[in-house]
Every structure is written in C-alpha cells, then in structure tokens.
C-alpha cells in the first residue's frame, strides 16, 4: 500500500468512529446501546461482542471510554437511568442518520459534521446550546427538558416535528419554512414571541408559556391548538388556518382574560364566504369581547385578493425596484 492509499484508509477509518465517555461515579457498570450499521462494527471498552441491526443490548463496561468503529447509520445510547454518558463524539460518523442520546449527562453535542442526520432525540440532558445549522436533513427533533436559552432550526428545511417543551430558559426560537406538522413548546416560560412560517402545521402546543405575548401561525393547517396557561398572550395570528367552529370556540375559551389591560387581538380566517363566516362563528366575537379580545375575520375573497396583490409585487414590482436600485449604484 502506498502512502496515498494509506492516508485515505486512515481517513476513512477515522470518519467511521463514535466515541463516548461514561461517568464512573454514577455508572452501573453497564452500557445500553442500539447500533445499525453498513457492514461490521467493533466496540472497544465493553466485554461482549457487538450487536447490530438496531438491537438494544446491555454491554458490560471494561473502560470508561467506549469507541465504536464502523459505518454507523443509527446510534441509540438513550436511556432513562441506565447510562451515564458525559461525552459523546459523533463528528466522525458522517453517514449517521439517526441519533438517540436522551437521558444522559451531556453538556455539549457537536453535530457540525452530521449533515445526513434525519432524526435527533437529545432530550433530558444538560445541554445549554444546540447548533443545528449543518443538519439540513433533519426531519424530527426532540430536545425536551434540557437547558437551552435559544434554538435556531432555520437550516432544517425538511423539519416535520419539533418537540422543545420544558426548556424553561428558552427565550428565542427560530423556525424554518418547512413541512413542519407538529410543534410543542410547552412550558418554555421565557419565550415571548413565536413565529411559525410552516404552511403544513396541524398541531401547536404552547401550554404554560407564561411570558408569551405573540404567536403567529397564519396560513397553516391548524386543527389542534393548546394555549392554556399563557397569561400574557396578547396577539394571536391564525389568518388563513380555516379553523372550524368547534376548534375556534375552544381557542376562545382558552385565551387569557385581558379585562383591565390592553385588548387582545385574535386574527382568524375562514374558508367560507363572509356571510357564512358570521354563521359559523356564531356568538364567538361576543364571547371573546367578554374577555377583552377582538376577533378580526378576513373573508376568503379578500384574502384571495391580497394574495393576488402579493403575487404581483413578487413577479412585477420587486424585480423592477431591484433593477432601479442597481441602476443608481
């Protein structure tokens, strides 16, 4: 083997390594792992031969450092008490698609080399930050009950489900224009504003977001909304969601009572015509007014006209303004 081939072989081996460190002080002496890989794997730091195919197996530790060699595509070291992993390095597992590391003692997680990752479950750890800017393939994220202060998932354009509830210090959440269908931010007590640009959102849970003042999920497909325990909520934008009467009534019932303070704004859109919208909503505007909320209803024909205007702006006016701007430079 010449030097070039040796270097390539060494690089390939390095890229197919996962390293983890277990806390000796709290370890049970066992390590639970589930591994799926292309080809064979080896595991250093355990007594038993490796199991693949996703089988969740209890290994006996022979070292606090465990090294997995092989082309791993799915790695599960998640647990609820059995593992005590304090460090996890997956930066050389470039073909990793699924990572389940929940229920450990991780304080950091580097995913900058894991562009192939589609599923991440890192909940119940001690992470204070999570950089997902390189995880462009992510579809499902569960980061419940860690210690995030901010979360930016705008790079995750394929995101379908996001669960980030019980991050009590989370003050900023940036979401992508993705096929997101479910969003859970329950009990994120410092979150003040939430904007969800997804057009496919069906489920929104903001229960217990005590500081939340504004939520914007207009033009989505919402059919389940949970807003209990949001005393500071003042602006709700669900224009274009076409909520039915039953869900609209539940929404109004769950809104906080704003009597004695600035009136709340509830923006709703119905797929029916303006005259029919009044019948569908029934007495909801009055019920909302009793709690000092104003309901703004945008009829379908007006919404369609606004969309046509926006389309004209995008296709005709904006390119013209850009050309004029370049001409004056």
Regions found by a protein language model. Give the residues of each.
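C-terminal polymerase-core module
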Residues: 154
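Acidic/charged coordination and interface sites in well-structured regions
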Residues: 88, 109, 130, 151, ...
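Low-complexity, intrinsically disordered short peptide segments enriched in small/polar/basic residues
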Residues: 40-43, 133, 150, 182, ...
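Concave beta-strand-loop units of leucine-rich repeat
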Residues: 77-84, 100-105, 121-126, 137, ...
């Amino acid at each position: 083997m010449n030097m070039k081939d040796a270097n390539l072989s060494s690089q390939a081996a390095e890229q197919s390594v996962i390293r983890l460190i277990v806390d000796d002080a709290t370890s049970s002496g066992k390590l639970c792992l589930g591994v799926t890989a292309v080809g064979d794997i080896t595991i250093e730091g355990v007594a038993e031969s490796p199991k693949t195919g996703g089988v969740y197996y209890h290994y006996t530790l022979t070292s606090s450092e465990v090294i997995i060699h092989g082309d791993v595509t799915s790695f599960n070291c998640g647990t609820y008490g059995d593992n005590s992993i304090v460090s996890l390095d997956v930066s050389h597992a470039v073909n990793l698609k699924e990572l389940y590391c929940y229920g450990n003692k991780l304080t950091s997680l580097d995913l900058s080399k894991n562009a192939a990752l589609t599923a991440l479950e890192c909940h119940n750890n001690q992470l204070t930050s999570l950089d997902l800017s390189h995880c462009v393939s992510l579809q499902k994220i569960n980061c419940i009950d860690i210690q995030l202060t901010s979360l930016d998932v705008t790079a995750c354009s394929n995101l379908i489900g996001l669960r980030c509830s019980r991050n009590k210090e989370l003050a900023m959440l940036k979401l992508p224009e993705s096929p997101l269908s479910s969003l859970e931010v329950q009990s994120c007590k410092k979150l003040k504003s939430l904007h969800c640009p997804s057009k496919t959102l069906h489920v929104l849970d903001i229960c217990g977001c005590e500081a939340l003042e504004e939520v914007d999920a207009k033009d989505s497909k919402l059919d389940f909304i949970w807003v209990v325990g949001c005393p500071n909520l003042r602006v709700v934008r669900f224009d274009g969601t076409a909520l039915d009467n039953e869900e609209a009534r539940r929404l109004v019932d769950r809104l906080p009572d704003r009597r004695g303070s600035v009136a709340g704004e509830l923006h709703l859109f119905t797929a029916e015509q303006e005259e029919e919208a009044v019948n569908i909503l029934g007495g909801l505007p009055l019920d909302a007014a009793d709690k000092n909320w104003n309901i703004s209803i945008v009829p379908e024909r007006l919404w369609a006209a606004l969309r046509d205007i926006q389309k004209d702006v995008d296709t005709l006016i904006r390119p013209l303004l850009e050309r004029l701007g370049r001409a004056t430079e």
